[in-house]
């Protein structure tokens, strides 16, 4: 399953939502330090400060931001260090 994240920006506040179904967390993507962090299952609230999508236990994949996205643009994010369409999920399968 691939997560399609809808990314929006309001001023310095960046938020996202996921089309993934069945996640225990509501946010799929978080922004910080020029990275996109995928972590529907949660992550480390201390070890990835500023780059976590949610606190709690689980896997977080940090993806360098290599493309500019327009407001409300869709990005297919995957854990292979890219923000281009791919068949992998960066959250919980």
From Swiss-Prot:
Family: Belongs to the hssA/B family.
Lineage: Eukaryota, Amoebozoa, Evosea, Eumycetozoa, Dictyostelia
An individual GO BP term: sorocarp development
Record organism: Dictyostelium discoideum (Social amoeba)
Protein name per the record: HssA/B-like protein 26
Pfam families given in the database record: Coiled (PF05710)
PANTHER family reported for this sequence: HSSA/B-LIKE PROTEIN 1-RELATED-RELATED, HSSA_B-LIKE PROTEIN 1-RELATED
Extent of the signal sequence: none
